A protein has these predicted regions:
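A general secondary-structure signal for short beta-strands and their flanking turns/coil
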Residues: 3, 95-97, 134
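Short, basic amphipathic alpha-helical segments that act as recognition/interaction helices
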Residues: 25-51, 123-155
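Extended, non-membrane alpha-helical segments enriched in charged/polar residues
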Residues: 16, 98, 110, 142-146
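Short, positively charged interaction helices/loops
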Residues: 43-91, 95, 143-155
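Surface-exposed, Lys/Arg-rich phosphate-binding patches that contact polyanionic backbones
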Residues: 11-31, 35, 54, 81, ...
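Short helix-capping and inter-helix turn/linker motifs at the boundaries of alpha-helical repeat units
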Residues: 8-9, 103
Length: 155
């Protein structure tokens, strides 16, 4: 089976979480980041498609009491956008945002596409076509406990 490559840049606060986890596990940063994303994709794929909702949305508010454990809840777009990398302005300047290449199987990529559509963040699609996975990937990773140690973003 062929794997698809998805390249995503991360803020230093997020990348440092990958580095800490990689040091703890004795693995490479990219390997750890891939494991974390695939873990979250598997969690999202394990629930019914209609049980994957965005925190604070109408669908989230409609979750019956006591049924939250059967749902996969994505962070709000404002929380995802807060952790998106800033654009580096100077040409030739070394970017502070580190890139990670994710390798996804076809079924994992399909789950990621569903997440993009569920999030419905304007910048991730153009006329129904997905143009970036960065919001979906970051949203999934923010749900992982390995990123719980990330510091707040200081603007």
């Amino acid at each position: 089976m062929k794997k698809e490559r998805v390249l995503i840049r991360f803020r230093p606060e997020i990348y440092e979480c990958f580095e800490l986890e990689a040091a703890y596990q004795g693995l490479r940063v990219g390997t750890v980041a891939n494991q974390l994303l695939i873990s979250e994709l598997n969690k999202a794929a394990s629930v019914k498609p209609e049980h994957c909702v965005v925190f604070g949305s109408e669908d989230y508010a409609a979750i019956p009491e006591g049924k939250r454990s059967s749902y996969y809840v994505l962070p709000e777009s404002k929380d995802i956008i807060e952790y998106l990398p800033e654009q580096t302005g100077k040409r030739g300047a070394k970017p502070i945002n580190k890139q990670v290449t994710f390798y996804l199987m076809e079924d994992q990529l399909e789950t990621l596409k569903k997440i993009v559509r569920i999030q419905d963040i304007r910048k991730s699609m153009d006329h129904g076509q997905i143009i970036t996975y960065r919001f979906a990937v970051l949203g999934l990773l923010l749900n992982n406990e390995a990123l719980d140690r990330k510091p707040p973003v200081i603007h």
